[in-house]
Swiss-Prot record:
Subcellular location: Cytoplasm
NCBIfam families in alphabetical order: gid_trmFO (TIGR00137), PRK05335.1 (NF003739)
HAMAP family with a match to the protein in the record: TrmFO
SUPFAM superfamilies listed in its UniProt record: FAD/NAD(P)-binding domain
Disulfide bridge positions per record: none
Recorded name of the encoding gene: trmFO
Entry protein name: Methylenetetrahydrofolate--tRNA-(uracil-5-)-methyltransferase TrmFO
Amino acid sequence: MFNKLSTPIHIIGGGLAGCEASWQIAQSGIPVILHEMRPQKKSEAHKTGQLAELVCSNSFRSDDSSTNAVGLLHTEMRLAKSLIMKAADANKVPAGSALAVDRDGFSKTVTAALENHPLITIKREEIQEIPENWPHIIIATGPLTSPKLAKAIQTITGTEALSFFDAIAPIIYTDSINMDICWYQSRYDKIGPEGTGKDYLNCPLNKEQYEAFVQALKNAEKTEFRDFEKTPYFDGCLPIEVMAERGLETLRHGPMKPMGLTNAHNPTVKAYAVVQLRQDNKLGTLYNMVGFQTKLKYGEQVRIFRMIPGLENAEFARLGGLHRNTYLNSPIILDQTLRLKQRPGLRFAGQITGCEGYVESSAIGLLAGRFAAAEYHYNCPCLPPLTTALGALLNHITGGHIVDEKTGRKSFQPMNINFGLFPPIASASYSGKRLPSKEKKLAKKQAITARALNTCIQWLINEEKNKL
């Protein structure tokens, strides 16, 4: 057991990830100094000086661990003795199958736990630079990282490694795409760095379908930017609904252009417009809608995007969005244990690494804390298996990405936990008979979660053995 006179691990940022990392490290017997600028300096979104303040919703989403990916992540984090999950459970409010919390009670519980821990010191101050004489650091400053610290991070990581605007296109589960309508083909059959000439899925629209789609976009309900998100649009990242409003033909000369594509199902008929889907992960279980960043309300996205031929039954792993964010190009600059490759004493955690959501941010904080603690004790960090929710999310951040056809660099966008991040599992059957589609989907999810919990328990056992 160390004491407060031992060399501490410095954690910058008192949000969900920073608090979880602090707890995991302190619980392993290592002193922590947690730096939080509030209330000395307020952010554009926070209202209080409490640690782990919930800025937006009070929901941690579904708590169903057998058929829901985020519910599975809840359970894995509970198994790993997560402070955030303990505080959420202690402050839960009625919300059906979801885990929702009293936001004030939740933040106070987390704050009290950290303030009362004998190995945690909380310093209310803004960190504007990354000190060279701190040997162990975790940066968990979230999507609203202060400008001076963001500049310091850019200096260390390189200017292209930090994004300030989050353009997200919807992502679709591959097995929900109608392959009787869609076909594989790259435009003009071009082969990219890791391509085959058939790297995109294509959804054809005739003139009538295209015009109805454009009109639906123009009439749809949009989500407005929050005050602290008001960043001007730039032409390379226009929401599709904004493009639709610029003219009827704008989209078919932009992301929906049909040139260089031939419908494999009907080669003699030229599509009037085409929506392209691009593989989003190495597993091939997810495809994103190319150029479809949007601020449409979620319900509108589902309704309108299912108008696209081939996507009439599409299931979405993530819906689109366009908002201010601060996140790293993590697959390029971080190693498997969330360390900056060029400065191994510096780790990143939470939303700044490229995860989305309260639970996901907390989970990456948990892993960063455990990895840092293992190294401090001169042990090799034990990575969670890819078959666990923790491992699948970590893999998304540090390596589960494909090379961008145009730039040759790994493409990377923030992501919530979803079943598309997990390795596939064999189709479920019952007594040798194949299940109906709906039952098959349910059985598949149950098989993935059962496998995940078994491997998570074994991972935690192995991690304990690693400490000996």
